[in-house]
C-alpha cells in the first residue's frame, strides 16, 4: 500500500517546515500515517494477510518512535502534528 507521487507531494507540502523540507520528522510521520491507514483498510478486506500485518506493526512502531522524537524536541510541534493528522497521542 504505497503512496503515489502526487499523494507524497501533497503530504510534503502540507507538513513541511520550510520550502525545501522533504524529510523532517513531521513529514515522515504524515507519510507513515497515510500508509498505515491504507494498509489498515487492506487488512480489513484481507484478514489472513499476515506478512502485511507484520509490516503494519513495524510502521506503527516507527511512527511511535518519530512521534517521541518530535515530542522531545517541542511539545507544541507534537500537539500540532497529532491534531493535524487526527491521531491520538
From Swiss-Prot:
It comes from the Bacteria. Keywords: Ribonucleoprotein, Ribosomal protein, RNA-binding, rRNA-binding. CDD domains: Ribosomal_S15p_S13e. SUPFAM superfamilies: S15/NS1 RNA-binding domain. InterPro entries: Ribosomal_uS15, Ribosomal_uS15_bac-type, uS15_NS1_RNA-bd_sf. GO terms for biological process: translation. Residues 8-24 have a biased composition (Polar residues). The keyword RNA-binding applies. GO terms for molecular function: rRNA binding; structural constituent of ribosome. PROSITE patterns: RIBOSOMAL_S15. Residues 1-24 are annotated as: Disordered. SMART domains: Ribosomal_S15. GO terms for cellular component: cytosolic small ribosomal subunit. Part of the 30S ribosomal subunit. Forms a bridge to the 50S subunit in the 70S ribosome, contacting the 23S rRNA. One of the primary rRNA binding proteins, it binds directly to 16S rRNA where it helps nucleate assembly of the platform of the 30S subunit by binding and bridging several RNA helices of the 16S rRNA. HAMAP family: Ribosomal_uS15_B. Belongs to the universal ribosomal protein uS15 family. This is Small ribosomal subunit protein uS15. It comes from Synechococcus sp. (strain CC9311).
Amino acid at each position: 500500500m504505497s503512496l503515489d507521487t502526487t499523494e507524497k507531494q501533497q503530504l510534503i507540502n502540507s507538513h513541511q517546515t520550510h520550502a525545501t523540507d522533504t524529510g523532517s520528522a513531521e513529514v515522515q510521520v504524515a507519510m507513515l500515517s497515510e500508509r498505515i491507514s491504507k494498509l489498515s483498510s487492506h487488512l480489513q478486506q484481507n484478514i489472513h494477510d499476515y506478512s502485511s500485518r507484520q509490516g503494519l506493526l513495524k510502521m506503527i512502531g516507527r511512527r511511535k518512535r518519530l512521534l517521541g522524537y518530535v515530542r522531545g524536541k517541542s511539545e507544541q510541534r507534537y500537539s500540532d502534528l497529532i491534531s493535524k493528522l487526527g491521531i491520538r497521542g
